[in-house]
Amino acid sequence: MPVMKGLLAPQNTFLDTIATRFDGTHSNFILANAQVAKGFPIVYCSDGFCELAGFARTEVMQKSCSCKFLFGVETNEQLMLQIEKSLEEKTEFKGEIMFYKKNGSPFWCLLDIVPIKNEKGDVVLFLASFKDITDTKVKITPEDKKEDKVKGRSRAGTHFDSARRRSRAVLYHISGHLQRREKNKLKINNNVFVDKPAFPEYKVSDAKKSKFILLHFSTFKAGWDWLILLATFYVAVTVPYNVCFIGNDDLSTTRSTTVSDIAVEILFIIDIILNFRTTYVSKSGQVIFEARSICIHYVTTWFIIDLIAALPFDLLYAFNVTVVSLVHLLKTVRLLRLLRLLQKLDRYSQHSTIVLTLLMSMFALLAHWMACIWYVIGKMEREDNSLLKWEVGWLHELGKRLESPYYGNNTLGGPSIRSAYIAALYFTLSSLTSVGFGNVSANTDAEKIFSICTMLIGALMHALVFGNVTAIIQRMYSRWSLYHTRTKDLKDFIRVHHLPQQLKQRMLEYFQTTWSVNNGIDSNELLKDFPDELRSDITMHLNKEILQLSLFECASRGCLRSLSLHIKTSFCAPGEYLLRQGDALQAIYFVCSGSMEVLKDSMVLAILGKGDLIGANLSIKDQVIKTNADVKALTYCDLQCIILKGLFEVLDLYPEYAHKFVEDIQHDLTYNLREGHESDVISRLSNKSMVSQSEPKGNGNINKRLPSIVEDEEEEEEGEEEEAVSLSPICTRGSSSRNKKVGSNKAYLGLSLKQLASGTVPFHSPIRVSRSNSPKTKQEIDPPNHNKRKEKNLKLQLSTLNNAGPPDLSPRIVDGIEDGNSSEESQTFDFGSERIRSEPRISPPLGDPEIGAAVLFIKAEETKQQINKLNSEVTTLTQEVSQLGKDMRNVIQLLENVLSPQQPSRFCSLHSTSVCPSRESLQTRTSWSAHQPCLHLQTGGAAYTQAQLCSSNITSDIWSVDPSSVGSSPQRTGAHEQNPADSELYHSPSLDYSPSHYQVVQEGHLQFLRCISPHSDSTLTPLQSISATLSSSVCSSSETSLHLVLPSRSEEGSFSQGTVSSFSLENLPGSWNQEGMASASTKPLENLPLEVVTSTAEVKDNKAINV
């Protein structure tokens, strides 16, 4: 196979880098998607993490990066929040935390979470490293802890720092930021001016190399190789010539080539240095850039030969060092560099011209060597027969022809060295190419033997070079010829169809890479003529990696043999898409080497590595399976694929295994590519969520139920709406101390409008309120009754108002409890959170049916969090409503003091029987009674008679009030009242008369009233619900605003001592119904007393809540 450049395409080697750096320390790490704001699902987990946690990879994938599935009872909640915060803010986290394995056993873990960025600087992944430090924790005894407290905090953190140093050294070493400094301690380079990131980036990057590393296919290296090739030819020519023709006799002659010889030796030495910094192609086809690997490779291959060839023998002559003749023979070792010529033949074998040129050069070099040998043989024959005066050697014959014979016992005279070399070369070439011409012939036995050998070599070389060059190349390099033929066809195809450069590069690279993998051999074509038995055994051996998966453990040998015939090998280059979203899935793929990523909408859903299985679960129906995501190669990947068509055929032949295979494949798939698989995932997730809500279990799950809202959208039956129900009895409200004893931390607020003339207006707004000051909920106190009450649909129906009599329009205060009979069977509002949490998940997913499982899971999590957030807001709202209820109770107590029944014959039926009331009868009561409400107002600075107070025209002048609005919106202008500390006294700054049953008390410059009515009743409390609110427009004027003073109550129902706050009704929220709203007169009330009498009114609040 021809020597190629190697695999040089840009690769995303992030996964390989992480795995390589962790190798040798601990490989417990996971990768999570940082682009998904909710959940940060795990896209890759190492085998070490699966072994540490006890979970399978399929169980870990797509779970949250916060590792909630590892939390347990003793897991620190503060660290949980810190992990969540670091993930949300995409910052680094490090700390020791207690985790729990799948079997429930705890272990201490040193957790490091690091954000990974892409080439744009965006955080796309989280790298979480897990280090088991349980053994280190166990070694710390209580005594050691006491000693640590005495000696300081430095020793207490020794185990933590040492474990962290070992763990984080791996992460920082990934980008080369780990430096070894003095005392062999590992320290972090915190130089802020360093541009390199502290951790590897998740991106496609070119192969990195040092500035001093030479590419073996670079232009400079190619030119240098040609220079070394010429120097090698020079050595191959000069070394034999100097050894045979020069010798030690004429040193002056040897000096003529000394300079060139030294220059060649210098070139060889430089070549050795460059070879230590030149890349090479490994057996797997990868280009090696690491200097250490290059050095090891060169030392174990060509270093020894190059070193011997570079020994400076010619320097001995340069310094006039006398050496023996054997030293010249050592220079022949340089001829071993000719073996490098074979590499050139491999590299340039696709160029026939270069190959023929090199072959001719080798033929000429061989003739040169044989000419040198021929001269040595003639010289030895002359020296051996010098005493016998033989003159039959080829040198004697040459001397005679050239008229320069030998004399002086054949030691002097003779032809020149130049003439002798030319004659010898002529003889060898004529002998190699033909039988010779006879002008130079062999005369002695030694010469004849050499001539025979020359003829034999000549015949072989002649046939090789001149006769059978094409045939020899086809026989020896048939695979090369096929490779070049296909390469040429591919280039012609590209040229004819005018394909773009990028597509051309992809095609050529894919062809070269696949050729390097299978060497151009089509295994199917090669094995088709073999019997099925032998072919099955061969394919089982070739595909043993995928057949060793747990998925095929239950398959019989016959099933595996049949299945192996339908397995094919595939190759994917970096950046190539194996599958695209919406494609018909034709096979199930097994990753043998390399790494891939699953993409959807440019978002990483999973990262696949060696040993991962991708495909789809099989359906009972024979239908086309569409993929729901793209599968893209990050590096060069070798794949094995099971063709689905053949798989179905095998499963039909082995039905006993088919059922098991269909069940197991959905668990063994690292990522399921079936379109619509997300619906099943969400269904399973919802079921798991419901189980976890009803029966919380697992390690460290926070089983806290949050309050929720369930909107009851069912309509009331028409008959029930029209049915008149008697008014529910109203119970007195217990004191604050009694409420504390009950300890109920859940109040249920139910509001209902009274049934007016238009009919009952039902509305449903049950709100579940949680109070934090109670130790137990009402459900915990009475579970049986709670379950009964939970099944009932609470509806408060109030009877229709009787127009004949004055209606009770007293506002009701919401305290969250409707206790009509003061019994345990009273109905309360209770709504479980399981229903609202499960209904959104059980419903079919909306939107694009091809949405990924991870996206739907994230949406489900978002919905869950939004519901929890809504529940939290509702909890806060109900607390505010409860507080508002307390304020409204105070307002109602205030209204009790100003409302009294309307009687035409007397002003106040309870305090006086006279037609015109006395001053005592104008004072408010301390408790609520069932008579009609009345309002007493004493304005400052004016005195009126009793007749004037009872006169209706005064009332109409002061208040221009619609009677329908008086009962719901009383307004009064009065002065601030104060309760003195000694008794129940109420101060009015300009009190000119004293009502009946009230005693005037003078203290200093102030006047106070004491209630002495015998009819005082404190057994009843205000109504506990209110459906009407005050209009801000009515209360906006300062002239019409009413400042009411409410004395507080004690436990016994009397007014407590102390300062009583003043409430202004203009600050209360809400609005009046326009039909019942009164327009208050803007006439100043400074000098007039006021009487406001309520009357029957039909009140309808259009803004009431319908549930």
From Swiss-Prot:
Its job: Pore-forming (alpha) subunit of a voltage-gated delayed rectifier potassium channel that mediates outward-rectifying potassium currents. Elicits a slowly activating, non-inactivating and slowly deactivation outwards potassium current at depolarizating voltages from -30 mV to +50mV. Shows no obvious change in the activation rate from different holding potentials. Activation is strongly dependent on the pH of the external solution.
Question: Which gene specifies this protein's sequence?
Answer: KCNH8
Q: Where is the composition biased (Acidic residues)?
A: 710-724
Extracellular face of the membrane: 247-255, 320-327, 379-419, 441-448
Taken from the record, one Pfam family name reads Ion_trans
Coiled coil start-end: none
Family matches, as PANTHER family: POTASSIUM VOLTAGE-GATED CHANNEL SUBFAMILY H MEMBER 8, VOLTAGE AND LIGAND GATED POTASSIUM CHANNEL
Report what the protein is called: Voltage-gated delayed rectifier potassium channel KCNH8
Q: What high-level taxonomic lineage is stated for the organism? A: Eukaryota, Metazoa, Chordata, Craniata, Vertebrata
Q: In which tissues is it expressed?
A: Primarily expressed in the nervous system.
Q: Does the keyword Ligase apply?
A: no
Annotated ranges, domain PAS: 18-90
Indicate where this protein resides in the cell.
Membrane
Intramembrane portions: 420-440
Keyword annotations? Glycoprotein, Ion channel, Ion transport, Membrane, Potassium, Potassium channel, Potassium transport, Transmembrane, Transmembrane helix, Transport, Voltage-gated channel
